[in-house]
């Protein structure tokens, strides 16, 4: 396995905003953390109870990813986690005053800006970067995910919305790095179909959703604050979600991930299979 210095933030940073699903205003604080802390969530800085950002703590995947531990819950974590993972931040304490991370403008831009504002500090201890040795695979109905051995972390995603001609079929393949995330992925906003709005509201979701933090796709056009940031913004946002969900594996790893029509639930399923494979390979080395 490869190794590099562990990394944390240089200073504490804060952001206040509204959660997209519950619609509550929340204060988000990111603080530096000691080596081997990992990425952990809590609602209060005075609390000793933290939720580690790990697959074992996933409790919900309905339109976002939710973590819980011992009765404490934090939802819509994927955009923030994708930013931390892509920037190589291993150790950070995250405090959120409500049960949902603020959505910002629906992209990862606000979290990227927070990390830039905080700065990144290398630490003395190292973190091992695992390399997947054998392919792993997950399929459910038309959703397909696979991860193959690679010397880099790469995602190739195919999005197919046969029922919405405005989105249609989109494909994007990228090696994920701080630079590619910053330029190609972080600006891409969450999206929904206009035809889904009533269903989502009946489910108690998108209570804080608006054109300022989401893009709506109709059969004959787009409802958005400004133009699309990329012609294929939806598939790029799907890559953003996938990075955040796979970061819950809990360690940096190298693989070529291929996804067709995946969402949070299937992302987590693949993440569990990757984790099982990495743990098995580590046992073989021992």
From Swiss-Prot:
Q: In which pathway does it act?
A: Glycolipid biosynthesis; lipid IV(A) biosynthesis; lipid IV(A) from (3R)-3-hydroxytetradecanoyl-[acyl-carrier-protein] and UDP-N-acetyl-alpha-D-glucosamine: step 2/6
Q: What keywords is this UniProt entry annotated with?
A: Hydrolase, Lipid A biosynthesis, Lipid biosynthesis, Lipid metabolism, Metal-binding, Zinc
GO MF, any single term: metal ion binding
Give EC number(s), comma-separated.
3.5.1.108
Single GO BP term: lipid A biosynthetic process
Keyword Metal-binding listed? The answer is yes
State the needed cofactors, names only.
Answer: Zn(2+)
GO CC terms for this protein?
Answer: membrane
Question: Which residue spans traverse the membrane?
Answer: none
Q: What class of enzyme is it?
A: hydrolase
Per its UniProt record, what InterPro entries does this chain match?
A: Ribosomal_Su5_D2-typ_SF, UDP-acyl_GlcNac_deAcase, UDP-acyl_GlcNac_deAcase_C, UDP-acyl_N-AcGlcN_deAcase_N
Q: Which reaction does it catalyse?
A: a UDP-3-O-[(3R)-3-hydroxyacyl]-N-acetyl-alpha-D-glucosamine + H2O = a UDP-3-O-[(3R)-3-hydroxyacyl]-alpha-D-glucosamine + acetate
Residues binding Zn(2+) = 79, 237, 241
Q: Which residues form the active site?
A: 264 (proton donor)
Note one Pfam family from the annotation. LpxC
Name the family. Belongs to the LpxC family.
HAMAP family, per database record: LpxC
Q: What does this protein do?
A: Catalyzes the hydrolysis of UDP-3-O-myristoyl-N-acetylglucosamine to form UDP-3-O-myristoylglucosamine and acetate, the committed step in lipid A biosynthesis.
Record's protein name: UDP-3-O-acyl-N-acetylglucosamine deacetylase
Which source organism? Chlamydia trachomatis serovar D (strain ATCC VR-885 / DSM 19411 / UW-3/Cx)
């Amino acid at each position: 396995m490869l190794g590099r210095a562990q990394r944390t933030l240089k200073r504490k940073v804060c952001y206040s905003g509204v959660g997209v699903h519950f619609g509550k205003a929340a204060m988000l604080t990111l603080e530096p953390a000691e080596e081997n802390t990992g990425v952990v969530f809590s609602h209060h800085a005075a609390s000793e109870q933290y939720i580690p950002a790990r697959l074992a703590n996933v409790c919900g995947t309905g339109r976002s990813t939710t973590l819980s531990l011992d009765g404490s819950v934090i939802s819509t974590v994927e955009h923030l986690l994708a930013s931390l993972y892509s920037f190589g931040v291993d150790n950070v304490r995250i405090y959120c005053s409500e049960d949902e991370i603020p959505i910002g403008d629906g992209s990862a831009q606000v979290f990227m800006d927070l990390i830039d504002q905080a700065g990144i500090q290398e630490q003395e201890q190292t973190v091992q970067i695992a390399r997947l040795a054998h392919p792993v695979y997950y399929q459910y109905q038309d959703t397909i995910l696979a991860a193959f051995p690679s010397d880099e972390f790469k995602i190739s995603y195919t999005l197919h919305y046969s029922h919405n001609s405005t989105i249609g079929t989109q494909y994007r393949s990228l090696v994920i790095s701080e630079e590619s995330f910053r330029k190609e992925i972080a600006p891409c906003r969450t999206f929904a179909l206009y035809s889904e709005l009533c269903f989502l509201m009946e489910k108690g979701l998108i209570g804080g959703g608006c054109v300022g933090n989401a893009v709506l796709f109709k059969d004959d056009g787009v409802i958005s604050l400004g133009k699309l940031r990329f012609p294929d913004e939806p598939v790029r946002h799907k890559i953003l979600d996938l990075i955040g969900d796979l970061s819950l594996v809990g360690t940096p790893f190298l693989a070529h991930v291929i996804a067709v029509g995946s969402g949070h639930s299937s992302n987590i399923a693949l993440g569990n299979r990757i984790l099982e494979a990495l743990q098995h390979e580590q046992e073989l080395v021992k």
